[in-house]
């Protein structure tokens, strides 16, 4: 067990080692403590067999703060000796490398790294500040430059696909490559740059596969290869990678969500539900997991079960997944008043950047519910707010296909068929299904839904039939339940698409 994300929830001297070993799927656990005094630290570590509580090895270290990283290599080597294990080259490089001699830079890097792994916009903004502080304190800190490059690349792939963000990612990566081109973290950043910025999935996979050959037990690399394989349409290979990533990092929310999403895409809903329930046993208040469970029941057409779960879904902010689950249940039930009231209480303010994305997504959801409930003026107000925010974002992100896809839905809600189709076509043209099996399928689904809302069965039905042949979110159950397809219900071709049953 190498990943920190799976172990950080446990205190340093946990009570039930056997249960923790079972949760993590490991035979041995390393626990320790650090005491700091001025510029010195005293470190205690011990290796314990989880099943028997037997102490296999223990050691103490006294170090100066600027030499603390050397302890990692000593501890790892001692543990490997005790377990008759052999550390591979890249793994040994990571744990024995002296990252920096500046303790303040080290502290800033560790804080930034912890926030980066939360993978949300709010945490990323603060993580960026810490990482920039780290490289300012130590301009030769290659590992910090590499993580800063990944952070900029992650932001570019989401809500900030601007030229400035691309340039920041490239500059940080180039600095890391100049400093230590063979460092594992730097090679990892190269792979993520190709994945998130260039969207060259073949090149990204090559970088990551080369790195995996040297670092085979890195859950992060396996997870990235899994997501890339999905986008390439290599679903079996994706499953293999994501299963291995989750096995190595079983407490990681990201690894679990990736495994769940794969099963959702491949319509293996029973398997997805088991993963969700296992996660909720560990984190019963995880709103995203609760929302995922609601969505699984919705996609199975089991709306009573979805109702039972959604009664415990009380988001405090306009989080995307819970809001979508609430909106979708109202759509499928065709009962809008309660969901409209719940969403109105969460109305976010318009901000900038990622805040505008959340603002727009929320207003599309609320606008859809008001449109379907017959409140045309209320729906128009929501769609107009979303349109204005998205158009503002588009000025600085003209190559962001997600913005065109969202604008297509907005203009459809406003009744502007020409503008809706123009934006939908633009999104599909920029990212076709042949280029990206996840995002491309989503864009084609948006276009087909718009065609259906305008009653254009001759275009919508063949598109939906095609999407049903691929992994994705279009299913016969969705076609049967979603009111956006009501204008097609009298068409025998559409009726045939609704006849199949999900797995």
Regions flagged by a language model, labelled:
Residues 449-480:
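C-terminal structured "cap/appendage" subdomains that terminate the fold
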């Amino acid at each position: 067990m190498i990943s920190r994300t799976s172990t950080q929830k446990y205190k340093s001297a946990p009570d039930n080692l056997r249960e923790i070993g079972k949760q993590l799927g490991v035979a041995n656990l390393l626990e320790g403590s650090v005491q700091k005094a001025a510029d010195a630290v005293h470190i205690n570590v011990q290796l314990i067999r989880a099943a028997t509580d037997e102490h296999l090895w223990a050691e103490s270290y006294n170090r100066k703060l600027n030499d603390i990283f050397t302890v990692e290599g000593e501890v790892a080597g001692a543990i490997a000796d005790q377990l008759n294990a052999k550390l591979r080259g890249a793994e040994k490089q990571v744990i024995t490398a002296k990252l920096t001699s500046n303790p303040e830079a080290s502290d800033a890097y560790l804080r930034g790294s912890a926030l980066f792994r939360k993978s949300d916009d709010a945490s990323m903004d603060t993580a960026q500040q810490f990482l920039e502080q780290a490289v300012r304190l130590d301009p030769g800190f290659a590992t910090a430059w590499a993580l800063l490059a990944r952070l900029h690349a992650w932001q570019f792939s989401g809500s900030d696909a601007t030229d400035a963000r691309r340039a920041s990612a490239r500059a940080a990566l180039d600095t890391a490559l100049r400093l230590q081109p063979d460092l594992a973290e730097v090679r990892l950043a190269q792979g993520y740059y190709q994945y998130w910025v260039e969207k060259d999935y073949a090149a990204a996979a090559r970088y990551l596969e080369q790195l995996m050959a040297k670092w085979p037990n890195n859950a992060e690399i396996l997870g990235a290869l899994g997501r890339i394989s999905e986008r390439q349409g290599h679903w079996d290979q994706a499953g293999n990678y994501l299963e291995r990533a989750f096995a190595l990092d079983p407490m990681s929310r990201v690894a679990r969500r990736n495994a769940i999403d794969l099963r959702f895409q491949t319509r293996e809903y029973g398997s997805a539900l088991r993963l969700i329930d296992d996660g909720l046993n560990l984190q019963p208040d995880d709103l995203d997991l609760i929302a995922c469970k609601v969505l699984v029941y919705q996609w199975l057409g089991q709306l009573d079960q979805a109702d039972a779960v959604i009664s415990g879904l009380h988001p405090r902010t306009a989080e995307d997944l819970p809001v979508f689950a609430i909106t979708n249940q109202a759509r499928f039930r065709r009962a809008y008043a309660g969901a409209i009231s719940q969403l109105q209480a969460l109305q976010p303010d318009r901000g900038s950047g990622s805040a505008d994305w959340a603002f727009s997504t929320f207003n599309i959801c609320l606008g859809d519910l008001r449109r379907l409930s017959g409140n045309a003026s209320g729906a128009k107000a929501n769609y107009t707010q979303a349109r204005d925010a998205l158009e503002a974002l588009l000025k600085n992100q003209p190559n962001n296909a997600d913005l065109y896809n969202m604008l297509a839905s907005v203009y459809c809600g406003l009744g502007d068929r020409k503008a809706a189709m123009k934006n939908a076509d633009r999104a599909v043209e920029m990212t076709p299904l042949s280029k990206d099996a996840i995002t491309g399928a989503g864009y084609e689904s948006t276009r087909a839904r718009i065609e259906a809302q305008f009653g254009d069965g001759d275009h919508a039905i063949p598109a939906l039939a095609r999407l049903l042949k691929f992994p994705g979110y279009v299913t016969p159950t969705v076609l049967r339940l979603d009111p956006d397809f009501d204008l097609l219900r009298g068409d025998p071709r559409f009726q045939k698409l609704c006849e199949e049953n999900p797995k």
